[in-house]
Amino acid sequence: MKWVTFISLLFLFSSAYSRGVFRRDAHKSEVAHRFKDLGEENFKALVLIAFAQYLQQCPFEDHVKLVNEVTEFAKTCVADESAENCDKSLHTLFGDKLCTVATLRETYGEMADCCAKQEPERNECFLQHKDDNPNLPRLVRPEVDVMCTAFHDNEETFLKKYLYEIARRHPYFYAPELLFFAKRYKAAFTECCQAADKAACLLPKLDELRDEGKASSAKQRLKCASLQKFGERAFKAWAVARLSQRFPKAEFAEVSKLVTDLTKVHTECCHGDLLECADDRADLAKYICENQDSISSKLKECCEKPLLEKSHCIAEVENDEMPADLPSLAADFVESKDVCKNYAEAKDVFLGMFLYEYARRHPDYSVVLLLRLAKTYETTLEKCCAAADPHECYAKVFDEFKPLVEEPQNLIKQNCELFEQLGEYKFQNALLVRYTKKVPQVSTPTLVEVSRNLGKVGSKCCKHPEAKRMPCAEDYLSVVLNQLCVLHEKTPVSDRVTKCCTESLVNRRPCFSALEVDETYVPKEFNAETFTFHADICTLSEKERQIKKQTALVELVKHKPKATKEQLKAVMDDFAAFVEKCCKADDKETCFAEEGKKLVAASQAALGL
């Protein structure tokens, strides 16, 4: 790369990076500005989501009251932007409103201390008290007729309750995307409550929304963790890699501009600034569609959709085709004598260009692998550019990439073979045993949830052709392991988990993969109560029954970490036969009591407990 070319790219990149696509004049009243931009319906929905994500224990009616008060105030400011308090920041307005909740101290304890602080510390304090695992009752789906009646009686309240229940259980759910889910939720009820067979129409749609919603929440949680724990630079690196894969024909300056704006949008949402976030996301979608010719040939269909569908579609759009005849990367990043000069001039720009060029050539790599390669390249340049002969030092840097690429390839190949051999449930069990032995201090419910989700990588990704397996699998595993990290951070019990979670975002999965059996772990004392079951297990769904059995499996491993696969399989086979036998018995409870004692004794003997 000629030096003059690099300088011109640097200028383009820097101006795009600092400018982005959002160019707004200052407004007298921020709340009036957002109300006008978003419209009353979206404004109210976003304020409800914001309050429910902060005050997760408050009753629905209390939140509706707060939302109505904020909405009426916003309307006052729309009518007269110079009216009293209309010039206050949104953080100040929302924080003041949260602090009026009478039961704040009683319900949230030390979170009430946030109200003594000034902005921006007050908002930071509220953010720190968001709970990823709130103590809320499990959502139980009512009968279809009951739901349809509630929908017809008061559609607005019905949909608000949906937003409220999801938002308070998922305090980092991407707010504009939750509006998209609510729109689909409404469409499902509108269609299916008029159908001849309401249940056959509605239930599959609700199951699909639930599963997609959980996945969306987990993906956004990783983005927020990236920003909160590793900073804006880490998020921008992720975004450069992902957008370069998705839009390989776009120029580097264009990708840089999109990265800047995407970072702003997600920073706002992760920071609780939901009105700004939704407004800026809409602007970003508008910009992408207006400039789709220079971004991607795959955007046409997305850009014809209404706003919420459009933004969702753009976020999920398939990768564009790679440009033909891209030159070798080695010329600019290894063979050139100007590498150290370019790197010293603007390190992040040069590394950003490396990541862009590498990612657009490798849609078959996971984003985290691309970031590992960029990190290795950066480390090599840091060392070599200070050496006597820099070029000689970094000449073989691409050779260092080979083991980094082969490690996830081999791991995915082995695990997909295991998945195909075992099927999802038994594959989950293999992962349960593996992870319980690695980090036995982690709570049993967390180990079960995380291992079940890790196990879904098989059915989600192993069916893909080789070229799509790694981006599917490794980036999915990053999302699931972040759930473990987030839950563990709240109540840390394992130094090994803390180390893997905090040292490097992109090396989390290799760190967990490399963990061996924890030899320092002192096995739990055997407790027969843990393995006592009752007739109610017979009425559980297949999924709930699996979770019961997997909970028992984790407990067995915690009692006997050195148990062999054969020993554990024998005990679990006996357990499955025991449940099947007693669920068929006339007197189920007696069967569970009598046969259960025999099973516990036989299991203890088999495992030498």
Curated annotation (Swiss-Prot):
<feature type="site" description="Not glycated">
    <location>
        <position position="286"/>
    </location>
</feature>
<dbReference type="InterPro" id="IPR014760">
    <property type="entry name" value="Serum_albumin_N"/>
</dbReference>
<feature type="glycosylation site" description="N-linked (Glc) (glycation) lysine; in vitro">
    <location>
        <position position="437"/>
    </location>
</feature>
<keyword id="KW-0964">Secreted</keyword>
<feature type="glycosylation site" description="N-linked (Glc) (glycation) lysine; in vitro">
    <location>
        <position position="560"/>
    </location>
</feature>
<feature type="site" description="Not glycated">
    <location>
        <position position="28"/>
    </location>
</feature>
<keyword id="KW-0186">Copper</keyword>
<keyword id="KW-0446">Lipid-binding</keyword>
<feature type="propeptide">
    <location>
        <begin position="19"/>
        <end position="24"/>
    </location>
</feature>
<feature type="site" description="Not glycated">
    <location>
        <position position="264"/>
    </location>
</feature>
<feature type="modified residue" description="Phosphoserine; by FAM20C">
    <location>
        <position position="82"/>
    </location>
</feature>
<dbReference type="GO" id="GO:0005507">
    <property type="term" value="F:copper ion binding"/>
</dbReference>
<feature type="disulfide bond">
    <location>
        <begin position="582"/>
        <end position="591"/>
    </location>
</feature>
<dbReference type="GO" id="GO:1903981">
    <property type="term" value="F:enterobactin binding"/>
</dbReference>
<dbReference type="GO" id="GO:0032991">
    <property type="term" value="C:protein-containing complex"/>
</dbReference>
<feature type="disulfide bond">
    <location>
        <begin position="99"/>
        <end position="115"/>
    </location>
</feature>
<feature type="site" description="Not glycated">
    <location>
        <position position="396"/>
    </location>
</feature>
<keyword id="KW-0597">Phosphoprotein</keyword>
<feature type="site" description="Not glycated">
    <location>
        <position position="44"/>
    </location>
</feature>
<feature type="glycosylation site" description="N-linked (Glc) (glycation) lysine">
    <location>
        <position position="549"/>
    </location>
</feature>
<feature type="binding site">
    <location>
        <position position="276"/>
    </location>
    <ligand>
        <name>Ca(2+) 1</name>
    </ligand>
</feature>
<keyword id="KW-0479">Metal-binding</keyword>
<feature type="domain" description="Albumin 3">
    <location>
        <begin position="404"/>
        <end position="601"/>
    </location>
</feature>
<feature type="domain" description="Albumin 2">
    <location>
        <begin position="211"/>
        <end position="403"/>
    </location>
</feature>
<dbReference type="InterPro" id="IPR020858">
    <property type="entry name" value="Serum_albumin-like"/>
</dbReference>
<feature type="binding site">
    <location>
        <position position="37"/>
    </location>
    <ligand>
        <name>Ca(2+) 2</name>
    </ligand>
</feature>
<dbReference type="GO" id="GO:0072732">
    <property type="term" value="P:cellular response to calcium ion starvation"/>
</dbReference>
<feature type="binding site">
    <location>
        <position position="91"/>
    </location>
    <ligand>
        <name>Zn(2+)</name>
    </ligand>
</feature>
<feature type="modified residue" description="N6-succinyllysine">
    <location>
        <position position="543"/>
    </location>
</feature>
<dbReference type="GO" id="GO:0072562">
    <property type="term" value="C:blood microparticle"/>
</dbReference>
<feature type="site" description="Not glycated">
    <location>
        <position position="499"/>
    </location>
</feature>
<feature type="site" description="Not glycated">
    <location>
        <position position="310"/>
    </location>
</feature>
<feature type="site" description="Not glycated">
    <location>
        <position position="97"/>
    </location>
</feature>
<feature type="modified residue" description="Phosphoserine; by FAM20C">
    <location>
        <position position="89"/>
    </location>
</feature>
<feature type="modified residue" description="N6-succinyllysine">
    <location>
        <position position="588"/>
    </location>
</feature>
<feature type="site" description="Not glycated">
    <location>
        <position position="490"/>
    </location>
</feature>
<feature type="site" description="Not glycated">
    <location>
        <position position="581"/>
    </location>
</feature>
<feature type="modified residue" description="N6-methyllysine; alternate">
    <location>
        <position position="558"/>
    </location>
</feature>
<feature type="binding site">
    <location>
        <position position="271"/>
    </location>
    <ligand>
        <name>Zn(2+)</name>
    </ligand>
</feature>
<feature type="glycosylation site" description="N-linked (Glc) (glycation) lysine">
    <location>
        <position position="463"/>
    </location>
</feature>
<feature type="site" description="Not glycated">
    <location>
        <position position="183"/>
    </location>
</feature>
<keyword id="KW-0225">Disease variant</keyword>
